[in-house]
Amino acid sequence: MFLVNSFLKGGGGGGGGGGGLGGGLGNVLGGLISGAGGGGGGGGGGGGGGGGGGTAMRILGGVISAISEAAAQYNPEPPPPRTHYSNIEANESEEVRQFRRLFAQLAGDDMEVSATELMNILNKVVTRHPDLKTDGFGIDTCRSMVAVMDSDTTGKLGFEEFKYLWNNIKKWQAIYKQFDVDRSGTIGSSELPGAFEAAGFHLNEHLYSMIIRRYSDEGGNMDFDNFISCLVRLDAMFRAFKSLDKDGTGQIQVNIQEWLQLTMYS
């Protein structure tokens, strides 16, 4: 979709096959992950509707302004290349070759990972880390992860897409553990800014408040699956913004079709 095609071009920076994987693959992938270090109401007349619209636009303008400021400081890893699984580089490291073999076991005959398969493998991995508080990765979370990484709109992740996502999850897991200073298994609201900055996201207070309301519990604590889900979406949205802001002004223009593609398939 538009979102992924945009951020993959940007510079800088379902079948449930998982159930039959067995403990071996889950154990190996568990080792890989630990290797990283650890509007206004319209009723009552036209005047009310107009006031609500103005309020909504001011809120939206503030959010977009905050995102543009943050995006200017974000330097993501290079996006995954669009290469087929069979295009094996001669100079691949043994670690990458091992990961490719594991991917073949996980992906099955179609050599792509569905949202259900992604959910199964992530939940196998987090069970090996009791220090990470989580309710588990749900299917909606995994569908969102697949959607923002799905460059060819197949609804599944190819090898490079999956490897890019997996490497980010490893990096963010290490950051999560580092900033869980009270060892509660969650990231508190006071710990969150440092964790996000370590991941490369410099946000203002307004955006932090929005993120806490969306991804944290009533006490302001964010568990591991919500932390990963939030960062996956931030990474994708920042890439999309940077690729659309071709002249570097911090402003973009999109039509309704582009806006719907940005917001609905993510």
Curated annotation (Swiss-Prot):
Subcellular compartments: Cytoplasm; Cell membrane
GO molecular function per UniProt: calcium ion binding; calcium-dependent cysteine-type endopeptidase activity
Residues given in the record as Ca(2+) 2 binding sites: 150, 152, 154, 156, 161
Modified residues (Phosphoserine): 6
Record's keyword terms, sorted: Acetylation, Calcium, Cell membrane, Cytoplasm, Membrane, Metal-binding, Phosphoprotein, Repeat
EF-hand domain segment(s): 94-128, 137-170, 167-202, 203-231, 232-266
Location (main, coarse): cytoplasm
GO annotation, cellular component aspect: calpain complex; cytoplasm; plasma membrane
Keyword Iron-sulfur recorded: no
Binding site for Ca(2+) 3: 180, 182, 184, 186, 191
Residues the record lists as N-acetylmethionine modifications: 1
InterPro entries, A to Z: EF-hand-dom_pair, EF_Hand_1_Ca_BS, EF_hand_dom
Modification N6-acetyllysine, positions: 177
Free-text note regarding domains: The contact of the 5th EF-hand domain from each monomer allows the formation of the homodimer and also appears to mediate the contact between the large catalytic subunit and small regulatory subunit for the formation of the heterodimer.
Entry protein name: Calpain small subunit 1
Organism this protein belongs to: Sus scrofa
